[in-house]
């Protein structure tokens, strides 16, 4: 799995994706000195209330597409493939909770990647999923919205914390931040979803969390 190809961008304003292996993303988070410098400066400027300077550092950090691969852009029309990955974002966690949340998500067998976000107060999670019953006519964008909701509800229950629902779009990018303790599990267990059951479950669902395995 470490050779899975992903689309990475030099920064949030970049529109030309570069294909890299998943293990290169992990290496950047763990070892890249330029990313470490941006992360340190962002946290310093933010602590001093210098929002513009902090935003400049964040915008300069690389970011990668979690759910899809892109070609020649980063719009929905530029999607060239699907990774089988989804994202959970726990940002601005209550004081002292980030370490606890990180430990819980790292211990879960579904977690492929977990790292502390650039704020230093959040945790980003990447996990795998499989779709049973998929056909060439399957609407992958609609399916991803369903997958995202179920996966995020699962991790929300696991941690007892709120997730960011704004990350539901398949084209959403995940910004990198330096984390020497980044967690990576090559053989992570995928969530499995049956497409027909998932569609049927959507209509009657009203605040009920569906069990996923």
Where does each model-flagged region fall?
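Short amphipathic alpha-helix segments
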Residues: 95-111
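Short, charge-rich binding segments
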Residues: 77-80, 104-106, 114-116
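Short beta-strand
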Residues: 113-119, 164-169
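Short, conserved phosphate-binding/catalytic loop or strand-edge motifs used
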Residues: 117-128
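Hydrophobic, Leu/Ile/Phe/Ala-enriched alpha-helical segments that form helix-helix packing faces
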Residues: 42-52, 105-109, 151-159
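Short, polar loop/linker segments at the starts of domains and inter-domain junctions
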Residues: 21-29, 100-103, 186-193
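DNA replication initiation modules
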Residues: 2-16, 73-96, 130-213
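DNA replication initiation on ssDNA origins
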Residues: 1-84, 200, 204-212
């Amino acid at each position: 799995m470490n050779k899975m190809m992903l689309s990475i961008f030099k920064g949030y304003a970049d529109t030309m994706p570069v294909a890299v292996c998943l293990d290169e993303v992990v290496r950047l988070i763990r070892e890249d000195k330029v990313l470490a410098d941006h992360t340190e400066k962002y946290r310093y400027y933010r602590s001093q209330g210098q929002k513009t300077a902090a935003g400049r550092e964040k915008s300069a950090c690389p970011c990668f597409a979690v759910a899809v691969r892109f070609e020649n852009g980063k719009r929905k029309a530029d999607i060239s493939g699907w990774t089988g990955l989804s994202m959970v974002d726990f940002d601005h966690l209550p004081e002292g909770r980030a370490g606890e949340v990180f430990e819980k998500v790292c211990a879960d067998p579904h977690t492929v990647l977990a790292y502390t976000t650039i704020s230093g107060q959040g945790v980003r999670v990447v996990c795998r999923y499989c779709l049973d019953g998929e056909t060439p006519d399957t609407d992958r964008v609609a399916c991803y919205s369903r997958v995202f909701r179920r996966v995020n509800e699962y991790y929300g229950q696991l941690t007892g914390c709120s997730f960011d629902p704004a990350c539901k779009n398949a084209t959403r990018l995940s910004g990198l931040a330096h984390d020497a303790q980044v967690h990576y599990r090559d053989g992570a267990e995928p969530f499995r979803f049956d497409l027909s059951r998932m569609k049927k479950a959507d209509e009657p669902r009203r605040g009920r969390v569906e069990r996923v395995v």
